């Protein structure tokens, strides 16, 4: 399959790392935190408790493996969607990518692929995996890897993050997304698609996430 790409003029943003927080600098010189920083903050205590429960050594090993798996699989997906030759990779990401191909081929008319976005209204920025049509409808699409399918209540922050990208994209271009899509390719052989159309619900949750983040950093 050959993927069609829509020519959208978006300016790439510079990134700045300040301690644990990643910022993006807009063309106007504003410095906005990444949406990933905000959504991660919301779940910070869950991960602190998990690390205490399993131990630092195991937690670091698990986290590093997950990061490596995700980065390598993302690269293969990106090449596929760019109609480029697929590079060689380790067996696991190759397997995760190949089993996802039939689902990836439901994507077309790609607006953004690994592109940076920002919102002056939200005072947020970030790098989105993909904005494209999925089954013929414009969507923010996030690619995830996992050992097995995750319950939806574990991944609320994925949907919130995607909604933020949708709002950023509308502010930048005037194009409104129809839905959020999480495409999760799993080590157990499952390829799971989570689709959400209740955008207003995730807009409200995003506001809560932002408030929680700002209250923490403002000492409230």
Outline where the language-model segments fall:
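Metal-dependent nuclease catalytic cores that hydrolyze phosphodiester bonds in DNA/RNA
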Residues: 1-125
